[in-house]
Amino acid sequence: MTKIDIAFIGGSGLYKMPQISNVKWTKIKTNFGQPSSEICTGEIGKTKVAFLPRHGKYHNISPTKINYRANIEALKKLGTENIISLSAVGSLRSDYIPGDFVLI
């Protein structure tokens, strides 16, 4: 299996990445059970990427049921050391307004 340069974990609002070419869905077993979904692998340009929909391929897993450890181990098994996790969330801080982009 080709080493993945960067992996994306999609949250609410991001269920697929049409920018990925040469798409292959791969089922990966982990020591923590099944990840949220098969993992989409392919390329964006010349970069090897993976995409994992956090809530499942059909958005059928609630936040309390997500197997986070399995998700991370599955991506690690693909050889990635770089993960970008995207989420649509709220905040109690008044200095963050809807539409702000926040890095943690």
Specify the residue positions occupied by each region the protein language model found.
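Metabolite-binding pocket within alpha/beta catalytic cores that recognizes anionic/polar moieties
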Residues: 1-104
